[in-house]
Amino acid sequence: MLEQQRSPSDALTVSVLNSQSQVTNKPLRDSVKQALRNYLSQLDGQDVNDLYELVLAEVEHPMLDMIMQYTRGNQTRAATMLGINRGTLRKKLKKYGMG
């Protein structure tokens, strides 16, 4: 039996209510893009120095929280699922006060 290959981004969706009041799924990247569009429009021409870190923290913290719940705190399994070294995971957990 052949397994169907899915792009990891296919599964990262956000449920939204469309103009016909129907719930649909859209890629997470679309929500991130909209959030950035909103943020940049509020800057009113001002520069910002830490946008990358700001966006990364907004995504990374809840991702780490959810993966640690999913793995029931198993850091080795969580690191494997994230595709990072366990030491790197421990640093990130410490950064967000999660470990």
Swiss-Prot record:
Residues 75-94 bind DNA. Pfam families: HTH_8. One of its GO terms (molecular function) is sequence-specific DNA binding. It comes from the Bacteria. Gene3D superfamilies: Homeodomain-like (1.10.10.60). Residues 1-24 are annotated as: Disordered. Keywords: Activator, DNA-binding, Transcription, Transcription regulation. Homodimer. Activates ribosomal RNA transcription. Plays a direct role in upstream activation of rRNA promoters. Belongs to the transcriptional regulatory Fis family. This is DNA-binding protein Fis. It comes from Mannheimia succiniciproducens (strain KCTC 0769BP / MBEL55E). The lineage of its organism: Bacteria, Pseudomonadati, Pseudomonadota, Gammaproteobacteria, Pasteurellales.
